[in-house]
Regions:
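Short, conserved DNA-binding cores of transcription-related domains
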Residues: 1-74
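Short, positively charged, Gly/Tyr-enriched micro-motifs
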Residues: 65-157, 169
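Proline-rich intrinsically disordered, low-complexity coils
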Residues: 2, 27, 31-34, 51, ...
Length: 209
């Protein structure tokens, strides 16, 4: 599994694709061997299914046998799609009478309600955990705030709290769980990370540039 790192772009998904911003991504040295000598080099790109046309720049360390990728802020980590799309799902559940009602309202494809509920739950469960962690991790921003999308958006006076939180919690991203952070999937299923908590999502397989 590639190690994901933050690529601060300030771009929307459409702008990222239009500008081919992955070409602007830079990783000046190996995160594992900052002094060099490991053969660290750019290693093409891999594609994300959504938004269409999205490519992610990556690098490879031969000595460490590790691949590193720079994930732009608008994309969800180890989940398909964008942070905004996942945030919309969670916000819909917060406002709905039940998770089933939210899933029924959100489903657009001809899938069963049970499948839609599973799809929604896979997004809601990790994000609810993340929001609770963020409130405790960043008291300077969220002290006394309820761990909900609505409450955190109101506190930050923003429309997209997950993208904003990736900026605020940038020094913790390797410990925070997906879809916000880049935590290792070995802590999937709600197990406790030595630093925070991890949860595994899904990510498309890498493809050559």
């Amino acid at each position: 599994m590639p190690v994901q790192l933050r690529f601060k772009t300030g771009l929307t998904g459409a702008d990222y694709v239009t500008r081919e911003a992955w070409r602007e991504a830079r990783l000046l040295h190996c995160p594992v061997h900052p002094r060099g000598g490991c053969g660290f080099a750019r290693h093409g790109t891999y594609a994300r299914k959504s938004p269409a046309g999205t490519l992610i720049a990556r690098w490879y360390c031969p000595q460490g046998h590790r691949t590193f990728s720079l994930l732009p802020d608008h994309l969800a980590a180890r989940f398909p799609g964008t942070l905004s799309e996942i945030e919309r799902v969670v916000a819909t559940v917060e406002q709905a009478s039940s998770l089933e009602a939210a899933a029924d309202a959100l489903r657009s494809d001809p899938v069963t309600l049970a499948s839609a509920v599973r799809w929604v739950r896979r997004r809601v469960v990790p994000v609810r955990g993340l929001l609770t962690v963020l409130v405790g991790l960043l008291p300077q921003f969220f002290l006394g705030c309820a761990p909900t999308i609505c409450a955190l958006c109101a506190r930050l006076s923003c429309e997209r709290v997950l993208m904003s939180s990736r900026e605020l919690a940038q020094v913790h991203l390797q410990a925070l769980s997906p879809p916000l952070g880049f935590g290792h999937p070995q802590y999937a299923g709600g197990e406790r990370n030595p630093r925070l908590q991890q949860h595994m999502g899904t990510d498309p397989p890498p493809h050559p540039a």
